Design a protein with these regions (language model features):
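Surface-exposed loop and adjacent secondary-structure segments within mature catalytic domains
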Residues: 1-5, 24-28, 41-107, 131-150, ...
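Short HxH-centered metal-ligating active-site micro-motif
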Residues: 5-20
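Hydrophobic, aliphatic-enriched repeat segments that assemble into extended interaction scaffolds
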Residues: 9, 33, 47, 53, ...
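Stable alpha-helical elements in mature extracytoplasmic
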Residues: 21-28, 40-43, 47, 96, ...
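Buried hydrophobic packing segments
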Residues: 25-32, 239-242
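C-terminal accessory segments enriched in acidic
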Residues: 101, 106-261
Length: 261
C-alpha cells in the first residue's frame, strides 16, 4: 500500500540525567490525546507519532532515585549545593556504563538492539533526539553545525532549516533564547540524529540547558532562575512544533523518503 502519512519518532533522555526530556514527553502525549486540542487532532489525521519517553531507563532511574534522596523540600537554587552536584557514576549511561547515544549504529547494548528492531519496522520520516546541555546555555535546535557527512542529502539539510524556523517562531513569541548551527554536527554515524539520517530520515538533536545540574530550579550566572518547568516547556514546544511541520509537509516527506531509497 502507498503510505500517505508522515511518521515522526521522538526520543527522550537517552542520557538519563537529562531528565527534562522524559518529563516533557508526558506533556506531549497529553497534548496529542487531548480531544479539546483541535490543532493536534488535525495533525494526527495525516501524521503517526511514536514516542520513546525514556531511551535510557537505567540512567533515568539512577538519576531520579539519587535526586529524590538529596533534594530539599524547599528547592535550593544555589548551584553548589548537593542537589545540583550529581555524584559518580551519574545517570548519563546505562547500567553497564555505556553511553547509548554512541550506540545507534553499533548496537552493542540490549536497549539499542531492541529499539533498532522497532525503528526499522516504522522507518520514520523525522526523528528528534531530545537532550540537555550545560545549565546556562540557551536552547539549541536544528539546523545542525558543520561538518555534515557527505552522504547527507540537500533535502535533509534544507528541511532541518524549515523545522528550525518553525521552532524559532514559537521561541520568539515567548521570548526564549536559542541558537542553531553551532556545536552539534552531523558527522559521527552513531548518534540519535545521524543514524536516522543515514536511514532516510530528517534526524535532529535538540538541547535544552539544564542537565543533572538543573534540578528543580537553579540560579543562572545572569541571576535569572531556570526551573524544571521552563525546561519541560521548551522541549514540549519543539516536540509539538516538529509534529506540526511534519503534518504540514506530509506529501514532501513521503516523496523525499521514497526518493532516498
Amino acid at each position: 500500500p502507498t503510505l500517505d502519512r508522515a511518521i515522526v519518532w521522538l526520543s527522550y533522555s537517552v542520557h538519563g540525567n537529562e531528565a527534562a526530556g522524559a518529563e516533557s514527553s508526558m506533556g506531549v502525549i497529553y497534548d496529542l490525546v487531548d480531544p479539546n486540542n483541535k490543532e493536534a487532532q488535525e495533525w494526527l489525521k495525516n501524521t503517526i507519532v511514536l514516542i520513546d519517553p525514556s531511551v535510557n531507563p537505567d540512567g533515568y532511574s539512577r538519576y531520579t532515585s539519587w535526586y529524590r534522596g538529596v533534594a530539599t523540600t524547599s528547592r535550593d537554587i544555589k548551584p553548589d549545593v548537593r542537589e545540583h552536584r550529581e555524584p559518580w557514576p551519574g545517570g548519563r549511561t546505562n547500567h553497564y556504563m555505556f553511553d547509548l547515544n554512541r550506540d545507534w549504529a553499533w548496537q552493542t547494548q540490549v536497549e539499542s538492539q531492541q529499539r533498532i528492531v522497532k525503528y526499522h519496522q516504522w522507518m520514520p520520516h523525522i526523528h528528534a533526539d531530545l537532550h540537555e546541555q550545560w545549565f546556562d546555555n540557551p536552547y539549541y535546535f536544528a539546523p545542525a553545525a558543520q561538518p555534515f557527512h557527505a552522504y547527507i542529502t540537500e533535502w535533509q539539510s534544507d528541511f532541518q532549516t524549515e523545522i528550525g524556523k518553525n521552532h524559532a517562531k514559537y521561541f520568539d513569541q515567548n521570548g526564549w533564547l536559542y541558537f542553531t548551527r553551532e556545536v552539534f554536527d552531523l558527522l559521527y554515524p552513531s548518534y540519535g540524529d545521524t543514524y536516522p539520517t543515514f536511514n532516510g530520515s530528517v534526524g535532529m538533536t535538540y538541547e535544552q540547558g539544564g542537565h543533572s545540574k538543573g534540578g528543580a530550579a537553579i540560579l543562572l550566572p545572569n541571576s535569572d532562575t531556570l526551573t524544571l518547568y521552563d525546561r519541560v516547556a521548551h522541549h514540549r514546544t519543539t516536540s509539538l512544533s516538529t509534529i506540526e511541520i511534519a503534518s504540514k509537509s506530509t506529501d514532501r516527506l513521503v516523496q523525499q523518503f521514497t526518493d532516498y531509497f
